[in-house]
Amino acid sequence: MIKGKRSFPKRQNNVRVLNSSRVEEFDISDHNQSIDSINELSAYEVLSLRKKTEDGIKSNLNEERVASSLTSRAEDNKPCRDFVKSDRNVLASDFLSKYGEETDEMNKTKKKQKKIMKKEIRKRTKRKRKSVNKRELSGSIKTWIPTHSGSSVFSSLFRNCDDSKEMXDSIVDCLSEGEEIEEIKIVNLSDSSHGSSFESDEINEDKNMVDEEENDEELIDERSTNSAVRENFVRCYGKEKDEDASDVVIDFEQKPFSTHCDSVQNGLDAIQWLIDPYDLTQFFKMVFQKKVFLVCHNNPNYYGNLFSTAKFIDILQTDYVEYGTNVNVAIYKNQQRSTLNGSGKVYPQAIQKSIKAGCSIQLTNPQSFCDNVWYYCDLLQEVFGCFVGANIYITPANTAGFAPHWDDIDAFLLQLEGRKHWKIYAPDSDDEMLPRLPSGNFTDNDVINRMLVFDDWLEQGDMLYIPRGYIHQGFADKDVHSLHLTVSVCRNVTYADLLERVIPPALSNFAEQNVNIRKSLPARYLDMTGVLECDYPLLKTGTMKLHRFLDSIFSNFCKYIKELSEPAVDMMAREFMRTALPPVLTKEEKDMTALCVAGSSLYGDKEHIFTKNTSIKLLRRHGQRLIYESEERCFIVHRMANSRVYEGRPEVLFDLDVELAEGFANLVNAYPRWCLVSDLKCNDAADNIRLAELLYSNGLLMAEFREAMK
């Protein structure tokens, strides 16, 4: 075995391929992936050119098509074990000899037609690339209804089509006779790039055209193998926008997602905005933790003022940012990643020198310094129920800062500046899927035999989702730097983490309640069995008794564990409250919490007084959790006073009298609606007010005081 090379078991691919053959018909640059997608012909131009080409040779092919049609009908009633047919009735050339001269003639005719069309398309591609208007390239691509489906469209489907009906009619015209017409949908199972070059090369394009003419059968075989790639990758495009609306830039300082009274709904809106126009329900059902997912928003300003290089410089100038703790400086050369951190405070000029030397910069916790990133991470915490962190990566032009690796988190990559080329590889086996720990650094030899599911550019304004366990590596463009924000979710919130928290205490309690499990092991148990294969004196009789006893214990213990699902979730919730970011409050929310000042002056004598008619509401749905320590004691743990640095402060909690627990439950049930203090329905009115005051003083509650409103 070559030193440094890692061996991995091959993955058994049993995931359904979603109509991958539909992608291939209009693919005109399989061997020339270095051509930027913005220089491709639009779908409308391809379809129009195809139609004209077909019309020019249709009369010459009429007799051959009639004969082939009769032949195909006669063959329909025969078994076709080896007969391969694509969605558009293109026959695979490897099997033609089995089906007579008529079928062979038909395929040759179609090949001639296809070659003529490719030549015309390539000539037109060159003309378009020379005359392309850069101003038009910044425009948004027009889209259609967001529906997850197996139907496929290639990258420039609706670029220059101003009339959606015209485009739909063009697609219908190109469908074969008798083929079922499907609704146009948004999902594109993208083709994976084959080349490693990121620059356009017109000379290679001409060479590829000749190669394709000579090796057309090889193209078909290559595409059939690529179909397995598409099961792990989904791509969709941004919605069509009016010219006036396209100039609107999101402003995170205005808390744009804090529009609902329910904090979970606000979080869902934030995720929907990130993956727009893809459907949120379909994302969690079909994509999340299953596939790499790319959204081309086609809007360089899509992320507004979320973060920028200017903001990073401002952080370095105004905050105490330290090497190792907040910033890492790394360089990747000769398949090795080296960390070149300094010591102490990070200064802008030092970062400037590092970037000039080809080093990448990682800001490990931008949410601690940038309110906009903090705000967005907090929104997602309400949905995922875990700490949501972020990283900023600045990569100089023509460099790669980090080695190939996988993460122990699900990552949303937001390309804020420049562009970056990503290569992503699927896990080789189920053992590598959804890992709980990050990997080490891989080399090119480690990934050479892995399934490449994504090999493409992430443009400014785009979003790329990478599930846990997918090896990935990024390269900046040769002419421009890259700055992207990685939002990390779902770290340490697996079922395994839940069981790790519940099984040890559950086993202890189970032993206290079950006398049989407290019995000593039988005499001479050492002679019953062991891992070493040898003649144990009591192997037959002793092992049988031991297994029978353990089977009974395990069966009862599993039943006991199932009854602990409720406290197990509470334990996970407690961990979330301990590690999560504190909530970001709007001005209106601050004015209705303990953060506001009663009256107009800190030195005034006004005081907020709770009455039975005071309107109250929890500040967040998942800002707090009531935990029962025993039947006689409970407490509330919350994240309202947490640090913006991960685990920067100890856990914050306070005791709650058990008799007030029902009132707290009524308050939780009322969310997201407002309710009166009297609606808490504790034992008496005094307990209602006592509970409201306790929650309010700890920052969990919003209240509307009539005197203050007046």
Swiss-Prot record:
Oxygenase that can act as both a histone lysine demethylase and a ribosomal histidine hydroxylase. Specifically demethylates 'Lys-4' (H3K4me) and 'Lys-36' (H3K36me) of histone H3, thereby playing a central role in histone code. Keywords: Chromatin regulator, Dioxygenase, Iron, Metal-binding, Nucleus, Oxidoreductase, Repressor, Transcription, Transcription regulation. Its EC number is 1.14.11.-, 1.14.11.27. GO terms for biological process: negative regulation of DNA-templated transcription. Residues 103-137 are annotated as: Disordered. It is an enzyme of class 1 (oxidoreductase). Its main location: nucleus. Fe cation binds at H405, D407, H472. It comes from the Eukaryota. Its cofactor is Fe(2+). Gene3D superfamilies: 3.90.930.40, Cupin, JmjC domain-containing ribosomal oxygenase (ROX), dimer domain. Transmembrane segments: none annotated. It is found in: Nucleus. This is Bifunctional lysine-specific demethylase and histidyl-hydroxylase NO66. Binds 1 Fe(2+) ion per subunit. Residues 359-506 form the JmjC domain. Residues 109-132 have a biased composition (Basic residues). It catalyses: N(6),N(6)-dimethyl-L-lysyl(36)-[histone H3] + 2 2-oxoglutarate + 2 O2 = L-lysyl(36)-[histone H3] + 2 formaldehyde + 2 succinate + 2 CO2.
